[in-house]
Each structure stands twice: as structure tokens, then as C-alpha cells.
């Protein structure tokens, strides 16, 4: 079954690569219209998924991610229309020029071909990824989590209806709607057909893809994010930043999970932190120094293994460090190269932190919550990459392209 999907996707990718920006935008507009017109069928499938997930004991946070409402589906359709407004990178000439040989060279952006995406209980990802892939002339094979397979199947049928209405192959967007987990392992070996694989899920999924995939894999989205409160930090704005980074949307990958506090500011800062976190409903997981704190916040002893994991909840590790060296060493040992920040009034320390912390996004006196395609001015994103090849940070449209070299001659031969 999967090989046939791969063959069809590869064939579809050749047709998509030839579409103009206007043609691709018309397809996206049609998809948005069909999502609204076929809302009832998608929501009906989603109700079944939610009921099954609740019966299986899925957490309330995960159920909320899984649930679609008319308003949420309308917002998803509007997001597709927003993709139409993004600049199309395909065909862009990156650089080039006339060589001494007389050959004129261009380096031009082109689609990747076929993108594979494996993701969990987020039905919006189906549409987000499909729209970004179509905008960049790529076909896509989607494998959502078992919790959303009815919703994903219904959504992809609607997208395929729009593709067909626009005269394009339905295989441009396909979903593996069989929840059998063994199909994931089969998908990971489809390098003959899939050009890039993006897993969006937990550490276990990422580890599986890195170890088993014969396809180039872009991993990321796991955010053990840190904020370092330097000795010169201004306490009032620092607290505002920490509250935003922890409480705005705790379940996201750009939420802060560990707060590192310079020992020289700890005595003044920690009581204010406790008061602010109590008001925000955050539980502090403190080291030995922090556990001596007497304040209103709920405080529990820090477990070392928690330093390497995402909470994705209103929980925050708090560790007192001796100096900047200690903060950087901690981030290198426990971070995931996602997003890390320093709060300081010392621009020398800020520059050092930016230069020495090797993460996809590094902030000075700002919240980690900004690591997002929309916030970066990239428009929508397909994922957040924490590796260095071939994309890093929020992956917008350009990250779904590669390039080719094109040489123009006039009977030109190599001497």
C-alpha cells in the first residue's frame, strides 16, 4: 500500500513543481472554501476521535489539542488563505553570474519533491502542512496519530476534492489512515519516494526516526528551554518575561522549562519569583538553595531527570548557578538547542551568552515564546528544527525548498 502511495506522490510532485504561484494560490483558496463547505463531515469524524480518545484515558490537555470546533476549523481555513499571501520562494534566483568561461550560472530555488510528515494528536497539522507543501510545489504523505485518524482521513478527502476540482492529482496530498504502528517503520524506509521526513512528536518518535529512517530527517520541536537570570537583571521586567514564557501556553515547545538564577541575585530575586509564580499557579521544582526559600509558591524538590524533559505544564525547574559559566554549562548539558534566553543589563554578558549558547533561537531580555514562524515574520511553519541541516529554527516556506544550479551557454565548452 505505501509503495503505491509513494509512486503516486512522486508522480504528483513533478506536476506540482511546474505550477505558477497563481495556480498554487487558486488551489489553496479552493481548499479553504471546501474546508468550510464540508465542515460537518470533518467535525463528525472528529467527535468520534475525541470520544474514543476520552474512553482510552487521554489527558484533558491532549483532548483539547485533538478537539475541533466550528470556530477552530474556520480559523484553520483562514490560515490556508493566509498562506496565499506569503511570497512563493520557488523559482527565486539566489545568486549567480557570468563566469570567465562564458557560462552564465544561476542557483535557483526548487521544490524538495515529496515530504513525509509523522505527527501526533493535532488535526490542524494536517491542513497546515498540506498547505505549505502545496505552496512550495511539494507533494506530501501524512501519517497522523491513531487518536486523529478519522479526522485526518476526512480532512484529506476534502483537500483531495479541492485538488481534483483544480485539475491536479489527488495524490499530491495523501494520508496513511491505517493506525497500525508498523506502517511507520515501513514509511521510514521509503527513501525511493520521500525526499525529506519531518517527525512532529515526542522524544521517542524522534529517536525512532533518527535511528531507523533511510530518509533525511528534520528533527525538532522538543523544547527544554532555559532562561538565565543574570546578576544584573532588572527584576520587574524579568518576572514579566518569565511569566509570559511559562504561562502563556504551557503545552508549547517554546515554553521555558528551567530557570537558571545567578547566585548573586538569588536572595533578592527568589522571593519575588515565588510571589509571582503563586499568582500564576506555577509549581516550582527547586534545587537545595531554592528549597530554603520561604514564599507563597508551591515548592517541591527538583528531581534531576526533570532537567532533561519537557513539563508542558505549569511547572518550572529553578536552579541557582554560580556564574555565567555555570549557566552555559547547564544549558549545554540539559538543553535541546531549541530556545534559550538571558535576562541581563550587562551587554557584554549578553553578547557572550548569544555567542556561546548553541541553540536555534537565543534571546536577550525577551521571552522564549517568540520562536514561531509567524512571530519571526516567516508566515506559517511546518515545524521547528533543532538541528543544523538543512534547516534550523522555525521552518517556513524556504525550508521546504532546495536549489539547483542552472548553466546557460552559447555553444560553451570547457577548455
UniProtKB/Swiss-Prot annotation:
Protein name as catalogued: Gamma-glutamyl phosphate reductase
Intrachain S-S bonds: none
Biological process (GO), any one: L-proline biosynthetic process
GO molecular function, one term: NADP binding
Function text: Catalyzes the NADPH-dependent reduction of L-glutamate 5-phosphate into L-glutamate 5-semialdehyde and phosphate. The product spontaneously undergoes cyclization to form 1-pyrroline-5-carboxylate.
Keyword annotations from UniProtKB, A to Z: Amino-acid biosynthesis, Cytoplasm, NADP, Oxidoreductase, Proline biosynthesis
Locations listed in the record: Cytoplasm
Database matches in PROSITE patterns: PROA (PS01223)
Pfam families: Aldedh (PF00171)
Primary enzyme class: oxidoreductase
Keyword Oxidoreductase on entry: yes
Enzyme Commission code(s) on record: 1.2.1.41
Catalysed reactions, semicolon-separated: L-glutamate 5-semialdehyde + phosphate + NADP(+) = L-glutamyl 5-phosphate + NADPH + H(+)
GO cellular component: cytoplasm
Gene3D superfamilies named among the record's database cross-references: Aldehyde Dehydrogenase, Chain A, domain 1, Aldehyde Dehydrogenase, Chain A, domain 2
Pathway: Amino-acid biosynthesis; L-proline biosynthesis; L-glutamate 5-semialdehyde from L-glutamate: step 2/2
Family: Belongs to the gamma-glutamyl phosphate reductase family.
Amino acid at each position: 500500500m505505501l509503495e503505491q502511495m509513494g509512486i503516486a506522490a512522486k508522480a504528483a510532485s513533478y506536476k506540482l513543481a511546474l505550477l505558477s504561484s497563481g495556480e498554487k494560490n487558486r488551489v489553496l483558496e479552493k481548499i479553504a472554501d471546501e474546508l468550510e463547505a464540508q465542515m460537518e463531515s470533518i467535525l463528525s469524524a472528529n467527535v468520534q476521535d475525541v470520544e474514543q480518545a476520552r474512553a482510552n484515558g487521554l489527558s484533558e490537555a491532549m483532548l483539547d489539542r485533538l478537539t475541533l470546533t466550528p470556530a477552530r476549523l474556520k480559523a484553520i481555513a483562514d490560515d490556508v488563505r493566509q498562506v496565499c499571501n506569503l511570497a512563493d520562494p520557488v523559482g527565486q534566483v539566489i545568486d549567480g553570474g557570468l563566469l570567465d568561461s562564458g557560462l552564465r550560472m544561476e542557483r535557483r530555488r526548487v521544490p524538495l519533491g515529496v515530504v513525509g510528515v509523522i505527527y501526533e494528536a493535532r488535526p490542524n497539522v494536517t491542513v497546515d502542512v498540506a498547505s505549505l507543501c502545496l505552496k512550495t510545489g511539494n507533494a506530501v504523505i501524512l501519517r497522523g496519530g491513531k487518536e486523529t485518524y478519522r479526522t485526518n482521513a476526512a480532512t484529506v478527502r476534502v483537500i483531495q476534492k479541492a485538488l481534483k476540482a483544480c485539475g491536479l492529482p489527488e495524490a499530491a496530498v495523501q494520508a496513511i489512515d491505517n493506525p497500525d504502528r508498523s506502517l511507520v517503520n515501513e514509511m521510514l524506509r521509503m527513501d525511493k519516494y520521500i525526499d525529506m521526513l519531518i517527525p512532529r512528536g515526542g522524544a521517542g518518535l524522534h529517536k525512532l526516526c533518527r535511528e531507523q529512517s533511510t530518509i533525511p530527517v528534520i528533527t525538532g520541536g522538543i523544547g527544554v528551554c532555559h532562561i538565565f537570570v543574570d546578576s544584573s537583571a532588572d527584576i520587574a521586567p524579568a518576572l514579566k518575561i518569565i511569566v509570559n514564557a511559562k504561562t502563556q501556553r504551557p503545552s508549547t515547545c517554546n515554553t521555558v522549562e528551567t530557570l537558571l538564577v545567578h547566585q548573586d541575585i538569588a536572595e533578592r530575586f527568589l522571593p519575588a519569583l515565588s510571589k509571582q509564580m503563586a499568582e500564576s499557579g506555577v509549581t516550582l521544582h527547586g534545587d537545595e538553595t531554592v528549597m530554603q526559600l520561604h514564599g507563597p509558591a508551591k515548592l517541591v524538590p527538583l528531581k534531576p531527570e526533570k532537567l532533561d524533559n519537557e513539563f508542558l505544564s505549569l511547572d518550572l525547574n529553578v536552579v541557582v548557578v554560580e556564574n555565567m559559566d555555570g549557566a552555559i554549562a547547564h544549558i549545554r548539558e540539559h538543553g535541546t538547542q531549541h530556545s534559550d534566553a538571558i535576562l541581563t543589563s550587562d551587554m557584554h554578558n549578553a553578547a557572550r551568552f548569544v555567542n556561546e549558547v548553541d541553540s536555534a533561537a537565543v534571546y536577550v531580555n525577551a521571552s522564549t515564546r517568540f520562536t514561531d514562524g509567524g512571530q519571526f515574520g516567516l508566515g506559517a511553519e511546518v515545524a521547528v528544527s533543532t538541528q543544523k541541516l538543512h534547516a534550523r529554527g522555525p521552518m517556513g516556506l524556504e525550508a521546504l525548498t532546495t536549489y539547483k544550479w542552472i548553466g546557460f551557454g552559447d555553444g560553451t565548452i570547457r577548455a
